[in-house]
Amino acid sequence: MGVRVGLLALSMLALGAASSMAQSADSRAAWSASANLITYVLPNEGNYAQPTVTLDRKWRHVEGRLNYEALNTASLWVGYNLAGGSAVAWELTPMVGGAFGDVGGVAPGYAGSIAWWKLDFYSEGEYLFDLTRSADSFLYNWSELALTPAAWLRVGLVTERTRVRASAREIQRGPFVGLTFRRLECAAYLLDSRHGAPTMALSVGWNFGSD
């Protein structure tokens, strides 16, 4: 039941993004949205997909995720967008969200980045307070340190802390490469490649909004 509700919520958020993009040109310029799908290819478990949909207007941020905190679990988020800098540009979105499905709880979270020259650092995280068993509360994190040698190419290192899947290490890490073509973004991540049974994550995303 929780998964159906989560899928419905993500669908409604995606439809809301599409509806916003269909407004007049003046109004549309204030909106941006994205849809991203990461497919995890696991060596010893079943593969799974993790979709995320976001919608932003000026300082407002709304986000929906599925299979992020746990399989068969959805989460919805609201946040506040902050940004600044020129030579060193930064963005920060503090958020609060709720998860429901196989895992239920509330979480403070964030997403942020800082960029200088051709280097950038991106990080997102949350601390989920499990409402069923407090001992199961957990800190999630995904971080990337990257170099962009060309506008269409981004390479670097990634770290991830999650409990969605089994891992020999508390924090998985590895290299990644990303490609951008207009609004389309694709990336491939290889986590724990030095431990004999690496996890591959394949990401594809699309950014909506007026140019």
Predicted regions and their residues:
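Transmembrane beta-strand segments that form the barrel wall of outer-membrane beta-barrel proteins
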Residues: 31-41, 53, 58-70, 76, ...
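Onset of an N-terminal alpha helix
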Residues: 28-32, 46
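Cleavable N-terminal export/targeting peptides
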Residues: 1-29, 209-211
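Polar low-complexity intrinsically disordered regions enriched in Ser/Thr and small residues
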Residues: 5, 9, 17-19, 88, ...
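Feature captures outer-membrane beta-barrel proteins of Gram-negative bacteria and organelles
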Residues: 47-58, 73-93, 106-123, 137-149, ...
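N-terminal non-globular leader segments, chiefly Sec-dependent signal peptides
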Residues: 102-104
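Short, solvent-exposed secondary-structure boundary motifs
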Residues: 40-44, 134-135, 165-168
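A mid-sequence, solvent-exposed acidic-amphipathic segment
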Residues: 133-146, 156-160, 164
